[in-house]
């Protein structure tokens, strides 16, 4: 019986040792698993934070790009509308009654004739300009109306064409026109 007791003691000791080793192994495995889960959570959290940051940056870029595109389209439309207004004004000047054209030419000639020796006009206004001015008629120019005055030797030219007057007024008034049209 002595041997059976020794064998039994060894078996119980071995079982106790196996149980202790299993318990330690389970504890160590649980600790490693928990650490791995924590590392995984941290990595996932970091990844999510990076993705959220990247999405926020991308969102901001898309919004900025969209805003720039809207501004570009708006400015192009405003320019197009202002160009249309300019074109309509040119057409209104071209089609104004002869009496009004004569009145405007008379005003320009009376006011500025002393500044020149020769006068130019459009072909359509030639007869009226010859009638209203005492200056030498020097020829026709390509314009919608008005006159150009020139000194004797041609070194000084004063442009009082409707084209240049309209262009100057248009450029000076561009901001004001834009404010009126677009509030």
UniProtKB/Swiss-Prot annotation:
<keyword id="KW-1003">Cell membrane</keyword>
<dbReference type="InterPro" id="IPR038495">
    <property type="entry name" value="ATPase_E_C"/>
</dbReference>
<keyword id="KW-0406">Ion transport</keyword>
<dbReference type="InterPro" id="IPR002842">
    <property type="entry name" value="ATPase_V1_Esu"/>
</dbReference>
<dbReference type="GO" id="GO:0033178">
    <property type="term" value="C:proton-transporting two-sector ATPase complex, catalytic domain"/>
</dbReference>
<dbReference type="GO" id="GO:0046961">
    <property type="term" value="F:proton-transporting ATPase activity, rotational mechanism"/>
</dbReference>
<dbReference type="GO" id="GO:0005524">
    <property type="term" value="F:ATP binding"/>
</dbReference>
<comment type="similarity">
    <text>Belongs to the V-ATPase E subunit family.</text>
</comment>
<dbReference type="Pfam" id="PF01991">
    <property type="entry name" value="vATP-synt_E"/>
</dbReference>
<comment type="subunit">
    <text>Has multiple subunits with at least A(3), B(3), C, D, E, F, H, I and proteolipid K(x).</text>
</comment>
<keyword id="KW-0472">Membrane</keyword>
<keyword id="KW-0375">Hydrogen ion transport</keyword>
<keyword id="KW-0066">ATP synthesis</keyword>
<comment type="function">
    <text>Component of the A-type ATP synthase that produces ATP from ADP in the presence of a proton gradient across the membrane.</text>
</comment>
<dbReference type="GO" id="GO:0005886">
    <property type="term" value="C:plasma membrane"/>
</dbReference>
<dbReference type="GO" id="GO:0046933">
    <property type="term" value="F:proton-transporting ATP synthase activity, rotational mechanism"/>
</dbReference>
<dbReference type="GO" id="GO:0042777">
    <property type="term" value="P:proton motive force-driven plasma membrane ATP synthesis"/>
</dbReference>
<protein>
    <recommendedName>
        <fullName>A-type ATP synthase subunit E</fullName>
    </recommendedName>
</protein>
<keyword id="KW-0813">Transport</keyword>
């Amino acid at each position: 019986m002595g041997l059976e007791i020794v064998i039994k003691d060894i078996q119980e000791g071995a079982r106790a040792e196996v149980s202790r080793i299993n318990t330690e192994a389970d504890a160590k495995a649980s600790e490693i698993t928990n650490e791995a889960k924590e590392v995984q959570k941290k990595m996932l959290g970091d990844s999510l934070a990076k993705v959220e940051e990247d999405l926020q940056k991308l969102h901001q870029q898309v919004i900025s790009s969209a805003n720039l595109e809207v501004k570009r389209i708006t400015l192009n439309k405003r320019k197009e509308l202002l160009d249309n207004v300019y074109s309509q004004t040119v057409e209104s000047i071209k089609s104004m009654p002869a009496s009004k054209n004569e009145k405007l030419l008379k005003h320009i000639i009376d006011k500025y004739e002393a500044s020149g020796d020769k006068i130019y006009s459009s072909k359509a206004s030639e007869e009226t300009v010859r009638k209203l001015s005492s200056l030498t008629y020097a020829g026709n120019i390509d314009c919608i109306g008005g006159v150009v005055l020139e000194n004797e030797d041609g070194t000084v030219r004063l442009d009082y064409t409707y084209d240049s007057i309209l262009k100057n007024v248009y450029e000076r008034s561009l901001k004001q026109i834009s404010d009126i049209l677009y509030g």
